[in-house]
Amino acid sequence: MYSNKANINLLTAHLIAHDIRDIVVCPGSRNAPIVHNLYEAGSKFQLHPITDERSAAFVAIGLWIKKKRPIAICVTSGSALLNCLPGIAEAAFRHIPLVMISADRPLSLQGQLDGQTIPQQGACTPYARCWQIDEITEDSQAREVNHYLQTAFAALSDNGGQPIHLNVPISEPLFEFTTKELPQVEISARVNKSVAKLPNHWQELLCNARLPLLIVGQYEEPFIPAIQQLRANNQLLVYAENISNQQDARMALWLDEQKLSPDAVIHIGGCLVNKFFKQHLRTINQLPVLRIDETDECPDTFFQKAEKLTCNPAEILQQLVDTLPTKNEVAAAYSQLSSPKHTFDYPIEAMFVGNSTAVRWTNRQWQVLNVPVYCNRGTNGIEGSLSTAAGYSLAAAGKVLCVIGDLSFFYDANGLWNQHLDGKLRILLINNQCGAIFHHLPGLNQTPALPQFVAAAHQNSAKGIAESYHCTYLSAESSCLAEDAHHLLIKLLNIESTRPVILEVFTPI
């Protein structure tokens, strides 16, 4: 039997109709009627219980990365919703379609000193559009709520993908479950965008360019074969990082990027890790830049008055494979590639890296060819890195490696508060007892406030956390992490465990 609340039943029916199969659920009484419906629907949904809402949205991001379909989160009323906001912001900047469902208390109780009662409508703005899914007492309201839900779920694919927020007021009595069937709903078909064509002036510009450059920022969609072809044919110089996930194209990371002087740039993907390369391109006078993505945005990352083409980048890149000539300077640039320190070749399904030092260290340490690399580079915050890896591991078949710094780990330690995690999750915790990146910022060492108040020096260890969450704990000391990384990874990946494994490496800054 389902809830007696018509708005909850209509919401449940739309979740099924729009093929939302995975839902992260958090504890609470106000959202309990929604959770009951989700559970009652049986095999229609796979529920992922997460206690800490600060972790929940990041777990959903990890699930989306693995499954590439919208994921929902369901929380109770009050600050539970606000605790999800960092994860919703991360999803917004990476165009990840999450469905944020918040139970709410009646509007009449706001401002009356009732518990867990805050203004929730629009609380995720500007990171997620909000629809109010009000309680239904007559047919006209049902039509209106049905329309709102139809519109909301359709918006998941807008602007290249985006999170949405469904706020669901629920009045008492909450726990009456006597409805036999969910309502029938129909969904509207979306019209696919037409295939785009490269503008003629850009076709001519790239054909005549001496050293055309393709820059691939963070890329989480499937590998684009055209990029590999453009590189192999010496048609474009490809600059890509590990989180670009473009296989051998990312060898361009080992160029001396400060000496590059391209005369045309195509820019796709999200954030770049390499700040200095970005700053270098900003110094080149009148550099033509074409930004290609499926969103309505037009970031001018290199301060060059970039032009924008709204389409799937793979379509344009395949056109370039068919039309661009071989470039001698591109071939010469590739011949000057230095060898990476190490090629990452370990039996894992995916790698997740924390922000700040961790993502930069992995970029310098390894050329990662056959394993996808992920990082929360939407907002570039330290929160949620462990939870995202944990979320991915819930749906993974193989081992998932999380390389993370100490501050990020301790900040998000509740990502391990999950009874469904198993030995697939392996964590390489780099503990240099502070935020090490702050010690490498020019000029910051001049302030005596640096160690305690900026870099957050500490003496903490993850051993107690591992015990609390029933994880396998290993530790090691390393005076040179770059040299010791190989045998440390072998140690971390080879141990048998039915729960996540943490290898905490104590190393100097």
What are these regions (language model features)?
Residues 1-6, 280-357, 461-509:
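Phosphate/pyrophosphate-binding active-site segments
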